[in-house]
């Protein structure tokens, strides 16, 4: 396959090149490649970069295919420019043993249009009491997490980190102290009081992060914090890094884009975990991205049926979708307004993910994997959930106008998504 008239970023500047793909690798990047008998695609001077890597998605299968399937989720991710994703273990069965993990791997092998690497659970059934068969499944999983739940016992988390260190696998944590949730459904603050909805305080997250950073230091383990949301959490991670503790973290697009002040009414589409916090928290997250405290952006794509999201904030399920809109929203809100550079955003969504987790992806260079996304930076669309490839329609961002639209995604050398109105084969 030959991609003609590609506009890539080289040392902060755009450069026009052609890209030759052989099998699953990039064979050559050069000006005016002339090869006969190749599938040639003219991308017409659109921006081309390494495919995005999402370290946090909920693909729901096996167990919850009413919400999403591996096939629909992978198509949605490809449409958003993602070529590699890591799938969370809150499934049925939970991938906590070789037997249960293999069920998920078989579905991924048969149905996914992009590269998908599963997480293994930290504890059996994600109950937080007994470690999963970590040694048995380590070679087949990306890392270990009980995402969806915080590991409540410090001792269990410490034992998991010791095992993670032994296996050279990261321990990835959804941080939430159950004793501090107190029946809350959104951030505890002025807005929750105005809406009459029980709130979840920021310390529910930050205290567990602080605990785990010290445990990671003791265990010499790579500790990665999921979907960081509070200013105190950013401070804890920043201090951990200053002390050379092996801590990394991610932020979601929605926590960068919005705060609790944007919740104008009791609408379940705004319910997510962790919740959107205050304006100061959002500003701290943006500052954390800019100063490198926050390493990567991950979507936390969490599809639900509409029935689960139309009950108001207190009774609706936690979670919003993000695979198809992450880059477009971030490009529109942060790159076009000169808060982030395009190069920074791309790194946050690809190269940095590969770097912190030691993956051989996230590069647009010769001999690297042919994971590529072509983006029309000028094209504008209006977000329409009814047009999503995901089964999930649960987003509060419907009708938002965005630029920077992926029109072609190539994963492992194969076309995973193509906008046939924009790209001619």
Predicted regions and their residues:
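N-terminal metal-binding scaffold of metallo-dependent hydrolase/deaminase domains
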Residues: 1-35
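Divalent metal-coordination and catalytic microenvironments
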Residues: 6, 24, 45, 56, ...
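C-terminal cap of metal-dependent C-N hydrolases
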Residues: 6, 312-315, 369-425
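Active-site metal-binding motif and surrounding structural segment of the metallo-beta-lactamase
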Residues: 32-49
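Metal-associated gating/positioning segment near the N- to mid-region
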Residues: 44-108
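A glycine-rich helix N-cap at a beta->alpha junction
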Residues: 106-121
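Histidine/acidic residue-rich metal-binding segments in metalloenzymes
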Residues: 131-297
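His/Asp/Glu-enriched, well-ordered alpha-helical/loop segment
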Residues: 194-222, 269, 290-291, 295-297, ...
């Amino acid at each position: 396959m030959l991609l003609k008239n590609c506009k890539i970023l080289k040392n902060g500047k755009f450069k026009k090149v052609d890209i030759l793909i052989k099998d699953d690798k990039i064979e050559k990047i050069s000006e005016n490649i002339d090869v006969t008998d190749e599938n040639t695609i003219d991308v017409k001077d659109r921006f081309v970069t390494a495919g995005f890597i999402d370290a946090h998605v909920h693909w729901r299968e096996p167990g919850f295919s009413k919400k999403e399937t591996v096939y629909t989720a992978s198509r949605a991710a490809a449409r958003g420019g993602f070529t590699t994703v890591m799938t969370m273990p809150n499934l049925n069965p939970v991938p906590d043993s070789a037997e249960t993990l293999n069920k998920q791997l078989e579905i991924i092998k048969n149905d996914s249009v992009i590269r998908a690497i599963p997480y293994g659970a930290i504890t059996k059934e994600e109950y937080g009491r007994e470690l999963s068969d970590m040694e048995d499944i380590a070679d087949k999983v990306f890392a270990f997490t009980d995402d969806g739940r915080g590991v409540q016992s410090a001792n269990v988390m410490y034992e998991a980190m010791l095992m993670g260190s032994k296996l050279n696998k990261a321990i990835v944590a959804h941080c939430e102290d159950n004793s501090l949730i107190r029946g809350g459904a959104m951030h505890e603050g002025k807005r929750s009081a105005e809406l009459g909805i029980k709130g979840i305080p920021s310390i529910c997250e930050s205290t567990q992060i602080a605990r785990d950073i010290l445990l990671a230091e003791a265990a010499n383990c790579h500790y990665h914090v999921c979907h960081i949301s509070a200013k105190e959490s950013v401070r804890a991670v920043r201090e951990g890094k200053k002390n050379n503790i092996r801590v990394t973290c991610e932020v979601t697009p929605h926590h960068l884009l919005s705060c609790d002040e944007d919740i104008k009414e009791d609408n379940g589409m705004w319910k997510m975990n962790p919740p959107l916090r205050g304006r100061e928290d959002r500003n701290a997250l943006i500052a954390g991205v800019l100063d490198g405290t926050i390493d990567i952006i991950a979507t936390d794509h969490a599809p639900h049926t509409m029935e689960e999201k139309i009950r108001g904030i207190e009774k609706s399920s936690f979670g919003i979708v993000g695979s198809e809109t992450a880059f477009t929203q971030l490009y529109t809100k942060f790159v076009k307004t000169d808060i982030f550079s395009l190069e920074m955003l791309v790194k946050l969504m690809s190269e940095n993910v590969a770097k912190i987790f030691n993956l051989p992806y996230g590069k647009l260079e010769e001999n690297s994997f042919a994971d590529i996304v072509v983006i029309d930076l000028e094209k504008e669309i209006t977000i329409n959930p009814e047009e999503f490839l995901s089964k999930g329609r649960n987003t509060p961002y419907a009708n938002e106008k965005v630029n920077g639209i992926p029109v072609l995604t190539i994963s492992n050398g194969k076309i995973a998504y193509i906008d046939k109105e924009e790209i001619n084969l």
